[in-house]
């Protein structure tokens, strides 16, 4: 039996306010999970992550398996001890990273053989191997091993990929249970941008039975309207009593639109990666700190923001100087700000759903950016 409990506390339209409960802690939803690819969220300490409002982080099975390897992580009792993070952790299965290798992999019914990006060695990864790795990592949410359907993909290619992922889903379930792992196991809905394939994928996953359902293959270059159409198609079909996770999607607008379509969980490298490139998220849009107009700008990134960078008074001028000099403090402060912004955005959406004001929140979100609120299904612009 899984250690995960999910309680749906409120709805407003399709937006959902809930709570995930694990032995290691509670996660309020909708939630954004900072990505710690190699066991750390780049540039900040675990205690900073918690102070920013994050309650769960993501670890990368593929990269941690290759480096430092399971023996080293096992010496620490798992990923929590290794990374010094005592809250819940979700680990992906490695499927997306294998997908991203493109020309360096070979997919068969059994799994995927690929050249390691670290040393070029041939490595095999399949459902059973992924479940064994995640058992050693001792994550709180385990993802099944799947094939991420590319975009664009013909319907025939998307169908064959989805059917392979379903067979791997059953093997993942069997291996996870066979290992006696009581962590939550999430299925991943595939099928590209084809509604009928998405329905078939979800039906197959539900017949196997999972603790939560992720929506995969929607951060691979598809237009926003096609992504939203798939979320709208899946919303009434996904089991209301289970958490829903939109994988790898993470612009602020994407989070708002995902929540509006019933998504509970998100992850993305965008807030941390963009911080390292001098792009800082605010309620009025993105501050691109390398622009010359910020050279003598004495404002903080976002006046009134409660993050460490803004509340301490670091100016845009100073941050631009640090960035131009390649000082490591620039991405550190930028990361603190961006993750604070993301976590506050999620907290504000949770409050709006609970109070029945999500429609007004969504309008205000776009108005602050000088943008028109895009209509939801059934609305007119």
From Swiss-Prot:
Gene source species: Xanthomonas oryzae pv. oryzae (strain KACC10331 / KXO85)
Chain's gene name? tgt
Query: Could you identify this protein by its name?
Result: Queuine tRNA-ribosyltransferase
**Pfam families xref list:** TGT (PF01702)
User: Which GO molecular function entries does the Swiss-Prot or TrEMBL record give?
Assistant: metal ion binding; tRNA-guanosine(34) queuine transglycosylase activity
Question: Where does the chain bind substrate?
Answer: 92-96, 146, 190, 217
Q: Which InterPro entries match?
A: ArchSynthase1/Queuine_TRR, TGT, TGT-like_sf, tRNA_ribo_trans-like
Self-association or partners: how does it assemble? Homodimer. Within each dimer, one monomer is responsible for RNA recognition and catalysis, while the other monomer binds to the replacement base PreQ1.
Organism lineage reads as: Bacteria, Pseudomonadati, Pseudomonadota, Gammaproteobacteria, Lysobacterales
The protein's job, in short, is:
Catalyzes the base-exchange of a guanine (G) residue with the queuine precursor 7-aminomethyl-7-deazaguanine (PreQ1) at position 34 (anticodon wobble position) in tRNAs with GU(N) anticodons (tRNA-Asp, -Asn, -His and -Tyr). Catalysis occurs through a double-displacement mechanism. The nucleophile active site attacks the C1' of nucleotide 34 to detach the guanine base from the RNA, forming a covalent enzyme-RNA intermediate. The proton acceptor active site deprotonates the incoming PreQ1, allowing a nucleophilic attack on the C1' of the ribose to form the product.
